[in-house]
């Protein structure tokens, strides 16, 4: 895939704002690293940030509605029938042109992109730079909530985008895939899936919102064998989607996200490796 098939720049969206074919979604997730649960509970949620100001006409993409309600691990994608129904309920049809973005953290938007594309939404792009870049380009914001009318949607799942725990176990044992950790290097050094390389999502972005240039991304992923199966993972399947998109922009088409990521891997008591001395 080409970069322009995956990303839309703010100027293009500005020129097309109001196009009735567009379905725009704010997929913001707010993470409060270093805070206690009690402190984080007092901070704004993604929905509250959206309500305070968003791209005009954008609806809110509530990640929880696309998540398995009885799954053991947070953010794992919903079962097929539920996912397809929720996509249609959100206003996305098979011929919709979808734009997703985030107020902060590009990976929040790429998670929405990955979920929707996995289910068969073909025409979907991520706003590069998110809401900060939109404002910088002269875009206005509006407060309050917007919703789209439901639309008929028939799923056509792209199973190759999804890596299960069993596939990752097989890759660890047989070495038949390139496993890539999207978490920070110091976290990776502490613990990671055996054999995994580390490419922190922050290496792929400027700040938290803007995907680096094509040349910069190519330099970062050049060592990854082109054509070989690439499986990206992180803590809970969010950051890993940004790495997966980055691979696609430079032609590494055989890339999947380990949806359960470390939440599932550690929760199931599977082996971990460490780079720390004495570990």
Summary of predicted features, one role per range:
Residues 1-279:
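Cytosolic catalytic domains that perform sulfur/thiol-centered chemistry
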